[in-house]
Structure formats: C-alpha cells, structure tokens
From Swiss-Prot:
Record keywords: Ribonucleoprotein, Ribosomal protein, RNA-binding, rRNA-binding
Name of the protein described by the UniProt record: Small ribosomal subunit protein uS19
GO annotation terms (biological process): ribosomal small subunit assembly; translation
GO CC aspect terms: cytoplasm; small ribosomal subunit
SUPFAM superfamilies found in the cross-reference section: Ribosomal protein S19
HAMAP family on file: Ribosomal_uS19 (MF_00531)
GO molecular-function term, one example from the UniProt record: structural constituent of ribosome
Function: Protein S19 forms a complex with S13 that binds strongly to the 16S ribosomal RNA.
Domain of life: Bacteria
UniProt lineage: Bacteria, Bacillati, Mycoplasmatota, Mollicutes, Acholeplasmatales
Region annotated Disordered, chain positions: 73-93
Amino acid sequence: MPRSVKKGPFYDNHLLVKVLKQKDLKNKKVIKTWSRRSTILPQFRGNTFAVYNGRVHIPVYINEDMVGHKLGEFSPTRTYRGHDKKDKKIQKK
C-alpha cells in the first residue's frame, strides 16, 4: 500500500541539507548514508550516495529514473552465489 499523497514522500532531513550544500559545487563529494528508507527526491539528481547495505557502503549515482524510489532499492543486502551445479562426470549413462 503506497504512502498517502497528503503526507508526501519520506526522507531524512539531513540528506536534503547535505545535497543543498553541494548544489553549486563543481566537484561533488560522495554523501555517506545509512538511511536506506529515504525516498529519492528530484533535488538528489546528479549526486552520488554511498548507501550502507549492512557490510559496506555501495556508491549509487542518482539519475532521473530513480526519483520516487527508495535508496535501499539500489544497494542489495544479500549476495546470491547461485545454485549448486551438478558435476557432469559423475552422471550415469
């Protein structure tokens, strides 16, 4: 169930403050964050966030298509190593 339009998108205020400080800078720094729950706002476009996945910070460059999604969607927390592959030498003919 989506969030109410009346309430607006959720975002941590400290992220918006950091983005607005870097707005006019030529060399933008990576913004390190643990806030996976924050919605990506249009003001975040063009910035790089290092989103924590529980182990390391993964750099995420924000583009227009990401607006409206959550930061955590672009920083996977689980690693998929694949299913076991059967050894073809052992198979009976």
